[in-house]
């Protein structure tokens, strides 16, 4: 798939509750697609190439989770829960006047997407869960060393910390291949890094999430995608969701890890287009 050649328009605003959001679209954008970033990530962590290619068909909505980017930064970890963060998403949707949209959640963002789909199912045309989990008894944990390294990234510089995290996501040879995208992400996000209090809050939110009881009631068409070699969110998590979500399809990617939209961008963009077209 070629890179988009259409002119991309970007509009930004902050809701009254302090959530910063962005709309990216082209002359051919139609339905809205909302992207929900995961642990510690602002909207700048979405690769521009990924967003711009999606904008050829969708009006793409991205936003800074609380504690990240230009959004509010609550100072107590207990002020961060998946429920509250899903409410932040609805604040964005309500502010933009959107009443129907596709929804994609990545990693911990998939937890927020599940919560949102449970709370506002009538708004969701289709759901994409990318490298995510339902939590609770369906959560398959990564190795403890991986979890500890994610929670405590090492490095003397911000770049070192970024690389510490991305090295958990990808094997060395994959990391090298994805380096141009990673460097681009760093350049657009380095001016507003996520603070330690927000990382503690996001950890609190993830630990407290249990969406297992939501799965039987979610009826929207759902595409579940995972890399078979994911070390951060073991593939069993996606398999567990698929087994308990009736209107779902499971796509497992060979030789893919915890960032299919970066490692396998062409395949993921094509999958989103095809899945959304069925709804």
Question: Residue spans of the language-model regions?
Answer:
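Active-site loop/oxyanion-hole signature of alpha/beta-hydrolase fold enzymes
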Residues: 61-62, 67-104, 270
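Catalytic histidine-centered segment of alpha/beta-hydrolase-like enzymes
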Residues: 253-269
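Gly/Ala-rich beta-loop-alpha elbow adjacent to hydrolase catalytic centers
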Residues: 105-109, 113
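Conserved HGGG/HGGXW glycine-rich cap/lid loop of the alpha/beta-hydrolase fold
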Residues: 17-73
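Conserved alpha/beta-hydrolase "acid-adjacent" motif
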Residues: 231-237
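Conserved alpha/beta-hydrolase catalytic His-Asp/Glu region
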Residues: 138-139, 160-214
């Amino acid at each position: 798939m070629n890179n988009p050649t259409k002119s991309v328009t970007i509009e930004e605003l902050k809701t009254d509750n302090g959530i910063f959001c962005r709309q990216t679209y082209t002359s051919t954008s139609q339905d809205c697609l909302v992207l929900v970033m995961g642990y510690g990530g602002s909207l700048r962590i979405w690769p521009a190439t990924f967003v711009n290619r999606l904008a050829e068909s969708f009006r793409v909505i991205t936003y800074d989770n609380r504690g990240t980017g230009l959004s509010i930064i609550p100072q107590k970890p207990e002020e961060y829960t998946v429920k509250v963060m899903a409410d932040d998403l609805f604040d964005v949707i309500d502010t933009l006047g959107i009443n129907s949209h596709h929804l994609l959640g990545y990693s911990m963002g998939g937890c927020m997407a599940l919560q949102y789909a449970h709370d506002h199912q009538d708004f969701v045309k289709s759901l994409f869960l990318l490298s995510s989990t339902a939590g609770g008894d369906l959560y398959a944990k990564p190795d403890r060393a991986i979890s500890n390294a994610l929670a405590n990234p090492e490095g003397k510089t911000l770049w070192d910390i970024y690389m510490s995290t991305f090295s958990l996501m990808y094997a060395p040879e994959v990391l090298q291949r994805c380096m141009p995208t990673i460097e681009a992400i760093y350049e657009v996000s380095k001016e507003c890094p996520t603070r330690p209090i927000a990382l503690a809050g996001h950890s609190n939110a993830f630990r407290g999430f249990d969406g297992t009881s939501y799965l039987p009631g979610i009826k929207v068409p759902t595409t579940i995608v995972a890399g078979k070699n994911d070390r951060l969110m073991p593939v069993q998590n996606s398999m567990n969701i698929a087994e308990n979500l009736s209107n779902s399809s499971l796509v497992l990617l060979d030789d893919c890890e915890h960032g299919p939209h970066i490692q396998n961008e062409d395949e993921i963009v094509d999958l989103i287009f095809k899945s959304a077209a069925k709804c």
